[in-house]
Amino acid sequence: IPACMVEDGGCWDPLGEAFNSATQRAETLRNL
């Protein structure tokens, strides 16, 4: 499985998406 799979929206990076999700979740908890 390639680290970067090309989709209609361009390039999707599973690890990058997971990292962004974790970052956003941490920011949300911090803002509570």
UniProtKB/Swiss-Prot annotation:
Protein's cellular compartments: Secreted
Keyword Disulfide bond: yes
Keywords assigned by UniProt, alphabetized: Disulfide bond, Glycoprotein, Hormone, Secreted
Tissue-by-tissue expression: Placental basal zone cells.
Disulfide bonds: C4-C11
Keyword Transmembrane helix: no
Posttranslational modification: Glycosylated.
Assigned GO CC terms: extracellular region
Any one GO molecular function term: hormone activity
Similarity comment text for this entry: Belongs to the somatotropin/prolactin family.
Descriptive protein name: Growth hormone-related protein 4
